[in-house]
Amino acid sequence: MKIAFMGTQCNGKSTLIEEFLKRWPMYKQPKSTYRKLIKSGKITNNEDGTQESQKAILNAIIDDTQAATATGDKFLVFDRCVIDNIVYSLWLNEHGKVSDEFIIDSRLIAIQAVKTFDIIFYVPLREEIKITPKKSRAIDPVYRQEIDHIFRALVGTYEKQQGIFFPKEDCPAVIALEGPPDLRIEQIPLYIKPSGKFFDESDGSLLSNI
């Protein structure tokens, strides 16, 4: 089982993953080299990102995923995935900072890389969550909202099975954890069993069995 959490910054995603690991301790969260890359100051990110930096981050995310998968661990949870990179690249594209060709190339890479996962949980923006300043973190509330709008648009393409950013075949389930922050973790047992495995088509979700 490989699970990823995606969503805009400063929105309680890391806290949610911490809660997830407490409830499902069989899961491991691999170390992130792309975060080290950002913190090193060698590349720019967020509003100041470039094609070079976004490419480096995309490669690092894919390398992290492949390295973790190669360990043979059955239960892995990731903070962000290739879709996050695409979202931030799309924002940069809208502001003339990366080319259309770059987006096309990144999309083709991401649409294959995303097949690695079994479930991707999308964490929608909750405006009541305060932005906490931190190194290498964007703290503009407008930017945070714009990024979330792009996430929602991409999730919409998944729901419509358009095959633009998510593959039509071998695609992970993409699930939005709507509602206030304290209810996010309570929704996950609808999809993940106490054993750490997910409810598949053969046994339905917990919700369908009620």
Where are the regions that the model predicts?
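Hydrophobic anchor at the beta1->P-loop junction of P-loop NTPases
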Residues: 5
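Conserved lysine of the Walker
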Residues: 13
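Short loop/turn segments at strand-loop or loop-helix junctions that form parts
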Residues: 32, 79-82, 121-127
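Glycine-rich phosphate-binding loop used to anchor ATP phosphates in small-molecule kinases
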Residues: 55-115
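A glycine- and Lys/Arg-enriched "phosphate-lid" helix/loop adjacent to the NTP-binding pocket
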Residues: 88, 92-159, 170-178, 203-207
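C-terminal accessory "lid"/substrate-recognition subdomains
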Residues: 159-176, 182-210
